[in-house]
Design a protein with these regions (language model features):
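Conserved alpha-helical scaffold segments that buttress catalytic/binding sites
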Residues: 1-194
Length: 194
């Protein structure tokens, strides 16, 4: 489990999994994060999924919770789709349920889960720089974690982009902590540590 500041954090973490592939990357976020660079920075908060797509051991990418207006330029969306990334909006999750998303993710694979806090709804994760209404709910992300741990091997998880000074009543810290505990519990129940 990695807890980080900006969404550039998963880039070196994913590189460290070289040799453990193929890996299916599951990305929860309001934004697609396929920018090549922002102000000359190629490995920052808007680029982790593009960088992941360049790693030979990352086999598939599922992007869940997308809904941020203006978060991607046409070229970035085109690049993501050309790579084969499956972009699943938060609205689709709400309308069809998290199980319909899980049905699209192949079983018996290695998974890495990267969570940008703004992928969750601001009612459960308010302490973010770019809040967008309509995000995933705690129970949906919890269900995703438990299902991935059961259907394959959940190699790791990160949660990033929490802005502590915006954390109303500690709600975001509590939600992040509960997700981390669910990751640990789900992997233990799946027999990872026996």
């Amino acid at each position: 489990v990695v807890i980080g500041v900006d969404h550039g954090v998963p880039i070196p973490v994913l590189r460290a999994f070289d040799g453990r592939g193929p890996i299916t990357l599951v990305h929860i976020d309001a934004h697609i994060d396929w920018r090549d660079e922002v102000n000359g920075v190629h490995e920052g908060y808007s680029s982790p999924i593009r960088r992941a797509s360049e790693l030979s051991h990352i086999d598939r990418i599922f992007q869940i919770g997308m809904r941020g207006q203006g978060s991607a330029r046409a070229k970035e969306v085109e690049d993501a789709l050309n790579y084969g990334a499956e972009i699943i909006t938060a609205y689709e999750v709400h309308e069809k349920g998290i199980d319909s998303v899980l049905d699209r993710i192949p079983a018996n694979e290695n998974y890495y889960l990267t969570i940008d806090a703004d992928g969750l709804d601001p009612t459960v994760m308010p302490a973010v720089a770019a809040p967008v209404a309509g995000g995933l709910l705690f129970y949906q992300v919890r269900g995703l974690i438990h299902s991935l741990a059961q259907k394959g091997r959940l190699l790791g998880m990160d949660i990033v982009e929490i802005t502590p000074e915006r954390d109303l009543n500690g709600i975001s810290s509590l939600t992040a902590g509960q997700l981390i505990l669910n990751f640990i519990g789900a992997t233990a129940r799946a027999g990872y540590f026996s």
